[in-house]
Amino acid sequence: MKHITQLLAAAAVSMAIALPAHAETTLTVHYPMPGFFKDVMDTISKKFMAENPDIKIQFASPSATYEEGIQTILRQVGTSEMPDITFIGLNRLRMLNERDVAVDLGPLVQKDGNMAEQGFSDTILKLAQVKGKQVGLAFATSNPIMYYNADLVKAAGGDPENPPKTWDEVIALGGKIKALGNGVDGIDFRWQGDDWMFSALLFGAGGKMLSDDESKVAFNGPEGQKAVEVLHRLVTEGGMPVFTKAAGEQAFAAGKVGFEFQTTGALRNTIKNVGNKFDLRTAKIPLINPANGHLPTGGNAVVILTHDAAKQDAAWKFAKFAAGPYGASVVVPGTGYVPNNELAAKSADYLGDFYKQNPLFQAGLSQMPEMIPWYAFPGSNGVKVTQTIVDNLSRIVDQSAEPKEALDDAAADVEDMLPRS
């Protein structure tokens, strides 16, 4: 009898373990760049599951880059391998939308009713919209800032407490830093690889890539001409050499460059690489037209792919959590990305004290009102279009072409690549 009682007790325990206390929804989540985001995703998912025990988060194999990420998702569409949620580069949201892959979050935003109270202002929401459609929620966002070597600025007669606020001032001081000699260069501007930093100059002048109907190139208009003229002057007057991206970053971190212009997302690594070699400072990037200028937003957004009703509810909870104040409080300190949530930026419960204690991060934060979406070209030639622009920027930097010539050549080539209705 005692043996039977023990067996029954053991069976009862076994059944208690086997049967969940509540129904569980499992979400498969895909993300890119594990070097940046693995720890971030692990931290966010653990916190989310602790607060939502009926939802389990499991991760698909991450992609090395944004480009690999979008290609992976497009290959998996319509298969059992497609995840329920993905994190996609902001400039590739259009590809998902044009192929009708992403779930329209507009109805979920409307149903929620209080997104602004959760820190999702209209400005923040627009970062992950495509032609007014809410394709995702911005997760990790960045804007371009000015990094500067306060020691070199001071040596060249500048005031580190009052860094340049216009491109004319940057160029003049860069030239003076170059004149210090000893292998020192004035400026590094990350024009390589994509059109993001060209967008910073173009949007900063109040310009745009294409006409409103996207049928004609607009980046070679007056604003674009001003943008490439600044790039030209950075070289001819400001002491900017022909750096590769990596070489420019290394030279700046070694104390051999006065100013560096690139993403705030590189801030944590820059702080680490500079160490105690010099007095590192950051400031807002100048706008060619301060009254009407804007800045492109880099980074990625969380996108819902599942059309299963039960999973969509769970996915919406996770998307808001990841892109919300807690998620931002995990992403920002570990990377340098700016918060994509206004509640996180202002509240002492999240990042308010962080910015007070880490002033180098304030430049990117202060530029949030100027952020607009990183433009994505229509059609299937987006990658070719971007490379065409970069190739012609290279001609300006290496001085093998005049700014207007290179810009007009880029415009003519891009015009031929645009889709025809």
What is each stretch, according to the model?
Residues 24-35, 55-60, 84-85, 135, ...:
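Short, well-ordered beta-strand elements
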Residues 43, 47-120, 129, 155-157, ...:
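Extracytoplasmic "Venus flytrap"/periplasmic binding protein-like
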Residues 90-143, 171, 201, 275, ...:
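Hinge/lid segment of periplasmic solute-binding proteins
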Residues 93-101, 106, 123-162, 190-213, ...:
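Periplasmic solute-binding protein
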Residues 107-110, 249, 265-268, 288, ...:
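Mature extracytoplasmic/periplasmic domains
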Residues 171-178, 213-242:
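Glycine-centered hinge/linker elements that transmit conformational signals in sensory
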Residues 197-200, 228-311:
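Extracytoplasmic/periplasmic substrate-binding proteins
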Residues 359-413:
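C-terminal capping/gating helix-and-loop segments adjacent to ligand/active sites or protein-protein/ligand interfaces
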